[in-house]
């Protein structure tokens, strides 16, 4: 599947695609939550869609990642949850799991506004909570979808969360001067979002100081982040928390007239206060995660004497409040990708294949459960059609 992209439109192929839409769809659903074992609330459900498919946008699923937010929803602890409904012909009100996925348009309404959509286009939903762990999905309007043609499968399937988050963090809060020696600092430098941040920032002429956990192969990991993903400099958490390093070594790293204008925090605890200390006066720290499960701690002096602003960022709420910004974000991301300034996250992802034509329900359920519970790389379910 490496390098797979949206296909061109060949009428015989897509007529065949539209005619092959099954009478029943298959989705992974839940009607309750469990903090102890969230996989136990899942089941595979086959149902006849209630929408008139001749008047709807019909999509078949190409891939969906399994994200931490998906797991938190199953646990019932995520602030944004889909509405449970009887629309899927279930005994109890249920929701389809999954917030993110890549789809292919297989049928468009016979009449009405299709926007820019064509059969064969690759698309993602504008909003979260649409239910992506399914073989087919139906949308009422073309405007509920964003075209992602031009991206490879791995980028397209993950752009709605990691890609959007990184792009908006870099571009929406600071008016950067690309001609100046301007920096952002971030912790969790090996995360998927952080890797996109360094690439997007580099494309804007912004330098990045990425903080990563101490480890035996620190130099090897730092080199990959700098050479492959465009981080300007990688430092360890020990260095991040070392005040002597901050006073003596960091100025050498940053160079003359350096301005550290933005901190991106997804860890919390001591790491968050340490990156905040490196900011210039009247700078901003954005918190978009809390991997350490420790509170964000900011020294009082930074607020009083340096005018630091600290605020939260949540991609789901941002895009709900301003869906047009999400559309523009995706377009901007695709432009950078086409220019070769963003690389595919393919190597960061472990794919799990769902035989959409021949696989049985129990195999599918076990596949998804394994994707939720196994450690290691980010998991993505890839549908084999």
Swiss-Prot record:
Annotated InterPro entries: GroES-like_sf, HTH_AraC, Mito_Enoyl-ACP_Reductase, NAD(P)-bd_dom_sf
Annotated TM spans: none
Keywords: Fatty acid biosynthesis, Fatty acid metabolism, Lipid biosynthesis, Lipid metabolism, Mitochondrion, NADP, Oxidoreductase, Transit peptide
Highest taxon in the source lineage: Eukaryota
List of residues binding NADP(+): 162, 190-193, 213-215, 288-291, 313-315, 378
Enzyme class: oxidoreductase
Physiological role: Catalyzes the NADPH-dependent reduction of trans-2-enoyl thioesters in mitochondrial fatty acid synthesis (fatty acid synthesis type II). Fatty acid chain elongation in mitochondria uses acyl carrier protein (ACP) as an acyl group carrier, but the enzyme accepts both ACP and CoA thioesters as substrates in vitro. Required for respiration and the maintenance of the mitochondrial compartment.
Record text on subunit structure and interactions: Homodimer.
Record-given protein name: Enoyl-[acyl-carrier-protein] reductase, mitochondrial
Organism listed in the record: Candida glabrata (strain ATCC 2001 / BCRC 20586 / JCM 3761 / NBRC 0622 / NRRL Y-65 / CBS 138)
Gene from which the chain derives: ETR1
